[in-house]
């Protein structure tokens, strides 16, 4: 490798030199300017890497290849012109050239390596040559002053994080030639206001537009099939989005914390992923058509403005905490395709006054309606066999509830803290009532217990939240089961036990 002299901050490169070799001027912090002779055809790997005082360089028309890391970390370099002879610019060739404001890339360049301009925080504009077919990973990542870019019609791929953290980029047009857009490609482009996503790209990938905090409008063209994981996470200005019939799946966290999103229509979406719309605090309505089959856990959790939602008959699964904390939701109809209301499905829906549970439901899961403080009454269908732990815990307005004869088990704390509940009848098939089931039901005065019960805790009914006995007037029990209950209930409540004679069988 040839050795070169630096004199008064200027590199002396002799005529006849054909290559500036690997790391030739690496970390030459006193180097300020370079004139490369016409004989040079290649600038080698890391040739000027970390030349932090380099302000100007002239690259002759003889150079065809600028290799990887060639000018990486030249933090004082303000502009550069790449000659028409160059066809390839290597990976990280100009990475972290933080003072670079402009660069002219000739049409001869067909290949730009990964991370070429990554961290060029002063770069304001750039032209991408028409013959370039791929914009590689991180090519313009963290070019925070880049305000405009034109993607040529020949480009078929935009790599991972290609424009990530381009905070000044206000608009970008993605041509239909593009078939793949990588993960995080436009993530944290905080000035980007609108985007049209072409149908030629089948999937909006992981964090493609995440944290684009100025993004207001998104048009997704027909042809896109999936909106990926965290695709629009944290797009706090997003008000509207057009979802075409081609989209079949919205992945987990796709729109999490899109706090300005007001409404959305999902015409052919089959699956709504985990936490897909979690924290969309302005979302008032969502419309799903008959194609949706699954609403995953926490899908709409924390959507505090959600007032209207129609769950289509095609839905067979509503995941845990799917509507948790939807404090404006007043009513909801569950379709007869659903067989189970799982853990926390409607927990904390403090405005929910009515809910229609269909005959298809067999299980009401734990905490399903916990904290629904406006719920006054509920009809549980005869199909339900199990009421889970804490299912109606803290439903302070619940005055009456009819537990159907189909129920066999009532879980722990199922009705704990239902302070308006006055009476309850436990159906004939129930064999077990969990601990604290009716604890804190301060208005409860009468209870009817069945013959079928084989286990009951002393804490099941009889204490308020302070640990003192409820003011019960009557505990109705079958006469044949009276001894059983006296053995299991506190002695202080024995005088409240009213023995019921067996029902007379009707003659046929």
Regions found by a protein language model. Name each.
Residues 2-19, 29-42, 52-65, 75-88, ...:
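Structural signature of tandem-repeat unit edges
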Residues 459-464, 487-492:
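A structural signal for leucine-rich repeat
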């Amino acid at each position: 490798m040839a050795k070169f002299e630096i004199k008064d901050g200027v590199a002396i490169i002799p005529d006849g030199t054909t290559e500036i070799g690997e790391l030739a001027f690496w970390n030459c912090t006193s180097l300020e300017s370079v004139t490369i002779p016409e004989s040079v055809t290649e600038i080698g790997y890391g040739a000027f890497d970390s030349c932090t005082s380099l302000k100007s360089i002239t690259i002759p028309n003889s150079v065809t290849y600028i290799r990887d890391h060639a000018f990486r970390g030249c933090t004082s370099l303000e502009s550069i012109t790449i000659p028409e002879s160059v066809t390839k610019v290597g990976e990280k060739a100009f990475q972290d050239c933080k003072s670079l404001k402009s660069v002219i890339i000739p049409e001869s360049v067909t290949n730009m390596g990964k991370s070429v301009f990554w961290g060029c925080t002063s770069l304001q504009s750039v032209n991408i040559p028409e013959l370039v077919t791929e914009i590689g990973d991180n090519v313009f990542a963290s070019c925070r002053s880049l305000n405009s870019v034109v993607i040529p019609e020949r480009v078929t791929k935009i790599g991972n994080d290609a424009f990530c953290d381009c905070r000044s980029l206000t608009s970008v047009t993605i041509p239909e030639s593009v078939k793949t857009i990588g993960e995080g490609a436009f993530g944290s482009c905080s000035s980007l206001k609108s985007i049209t996503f072409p149908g030629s790209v089948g999937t909006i990938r992981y964090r493609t537009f995440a944290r684009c905090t100025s993004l207001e409008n998104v048009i997704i063209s027909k042809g896109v099939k999936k909106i990926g994981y965290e695709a629009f996470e944290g797009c706090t200005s997003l008000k509207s989005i057009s979802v075409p019939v081609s989209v079949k799946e919205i992945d987990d966290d796709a729109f999490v914390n899109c706090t300005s999103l007001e409404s959305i229509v999902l015409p052919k979406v089959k699956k709504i992923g985990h936490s897909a719309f979690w924290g969309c605090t302005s979302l008032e309505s969502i419309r799903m058509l008959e194609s949706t089959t699954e609403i995953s856990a926490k899908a709409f959790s924390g959507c505090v403005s959600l007032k209207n939602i129609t769950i289509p008959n095609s839905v067979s699964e509503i995941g845990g905490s799917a509507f948790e904390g939807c404090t404006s939701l007043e009513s909801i109809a569950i379709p007869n395709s659903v067989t189970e209301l799982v853990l926390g499905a409607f927990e904390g829906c403090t405005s929910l006054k009515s809910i229609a549970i269909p005959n298809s439901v067999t299980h009401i899961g734990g905490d399903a309606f916990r904290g629904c403080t406006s719920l006054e009454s509920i009809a549980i269908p005869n199909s339900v066999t199990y009421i889970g732990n804490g299912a109606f815990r803290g439903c302070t307005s619940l005055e009456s509830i009819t537990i159907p004869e189909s129920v066999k088990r009532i879980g722990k704390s199922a009705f704990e803290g239902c302070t308006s509940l006055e009476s309850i009848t436990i159906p004939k098939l129930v064999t077990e009532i969990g601990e604290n089931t009716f604890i804190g039901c301060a208005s409860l005065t009468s209870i009817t217990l069945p013959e079928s019960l084989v286990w009951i805790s002393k804490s099941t009914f009889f204490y308020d939240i302070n640990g003192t006995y409820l003011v019960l007037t009557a505990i109705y029990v079958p006469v044949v089961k009276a001894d059983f209950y006296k053995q299991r209930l506190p002695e202080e409540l024995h005088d409240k036990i009213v023995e019921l004679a067996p029902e007379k069988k009707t003659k046929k």
